[in-house]
UniProtKB/Swiss-Prot annotation:
InterPro entries: GlcNAc_PI_deacetylase-related (IPR003737), LmbE-like_dom_sf (IPR024078), Mycothiol_biosynthesis_MshB (IPR017810)
Keyword terms of this UniProt record: Hydrolase, Metal-binding, Zinc
The species this protein was found in: Streptomyces bingchenggensis (strain BCW-1)
Top-level enzyme category: hydrolase
GO biological process, one term: mycothiol biosynthetic process
Cofactor stoichiometry and binding remark: Binds 1 zinc ion per subunit.
Gene Ontology molecular functions: N-acetylglucosaminylinositol deacetylase activity; zinc ion binding
Official protein name in the record: 1D-myo-inositol 2-acetamido-2-deoxy-alpha-D-glucopyranoside deacetylase
EC number annotated for this UniProt entry: 3.5.1.103
């Protein structure tokens, strides 16, 4: 018997544990609370991540190489904070290893995500698409937001999986083809980011982090005019912050600000922004910028 699916279904594809909470935590919490099916697919365990707490430094790839399993636990706690129950790792936990930063020796490991054949990796995701049948997909832009090989590869795999899942002749054993109605890429409007940096600078000596990031340190920054959708997740700001705190090896959260292992402070925002690249935009009523305020706007449910 075919299970009855929720009316609204959102799929997010991310490279590493923590990417989902930083980029889309408020969006995920909002739609999950409203009864939508929210499915997260994470492509690697993030084994090559830099570790913030000194007490956990032994987990690093060049020591115990145990960061990946630890981050599985962090992600589970984050998903609970966001109210999301459907989370999967692409091809199963550990199928693809974190590739490290672009140009690192880890890029050459045969098991790393960067080295995966796109169609092979996309096959795992197409299976998920055929199963959960999302109307909306969220992932990165072609540059992966900031050029990390796993983010670039996640973009390629997500876009290819959307094509494969919609192809009637592809893997009939996976069920009927499914066309995703709307595809969005994550982005951050430059003006909002600069306003957040200004709030950080205004803290003066009381700033929670010793240094402040710049726009060049933040993935996916775009000119405001390019943003096509903004999800107001203000009611879920604490859920997002709690999810980010769960990723303690990677993120330090202090009030409305956070820093990664580079210790550069940046604003923690529950206003999350997107660029629609497939589908029809339906601007919110009264929007003076012509942006959508709902990723499902115009979608038949």
């Amino acid at each position: 018997m075919t299970p009855v699916l929720p009316a609204r279904r959102l799929l997010l594809v991310h490279a590493h544990p923590d990417d989902e909470s930083i980029n889309n935590g408020a969006t995920m919490a909002k739609y999950a609370a409203e009864g939508a099916q929210v499915t997260l697919v994470t492509c690697t365990l993030g084994e090559e991540g830099e570790i913030i707490p000194p007490a956990l430094a032994h987990l690093a790839a060049d020591r115990d190489d145990a960061l990946g399993p630890h981050r599985i636990g962090e992600l589970a706690v984050a998903m609970k904070a966001l109210g999301v129950s459907d989370h999967r790792f692409l091809g199963g936990p550990g199928r693809y290893r974190d590739s490290g930063m672009m140009g690192a020796p880890q890029n050459d490991r045969p098991e790393c995500f960067w080295r995966a054949e796109v169609d092979d990796a996309a096959a795992h995701l197409a299976e998920v698409v055929r199963e959960v049948r999302p109307q909306v997909l969220v992932t990165y832009d072609p540059h992966g937001g900031y050029g990390h090989p796993d983010h670039i590869q996640a973009h390629r795999v997500a876009m290819r999986a959307a094509e494969l899942a919609a192809e009637p002749a592809y893997r009939r054993d996976l069920g009927d083809p499914h066309q995703i109605a709307k595809i969005y890429w994550n982005c951050v409007p430059r003006s909002e980011l600069e306003e957040g940096f200004a709030r950080l600078r205004a803290q003066g000596d009381g700033a929670p982090f010793p240094r402040i990031a710049s726009a060049g340190d933040v993935p996916g920054v775009v000119d405001d005019a390019r943003v096509t959708a903004t999800v107001d997740g203000a009611g879920y700001a604490e859920a997002k912050a709690e999810a980010m705190r769960a990723h303690a090896t990677q993120i330090a959260v202090d009030g409305p600000f956070f820093a990664l292992s580079n210790d550069l402070g940046q604003p923690l925002s529950a206003m999350e922004h997107y660029l629609l690249v497939r589908g029809q935009a339906v601007a919110a009523s009264g929007s003076d910028r012509g942006r959508e305020d709902d990723l499902f706007a115009g979608v038949s449910v």
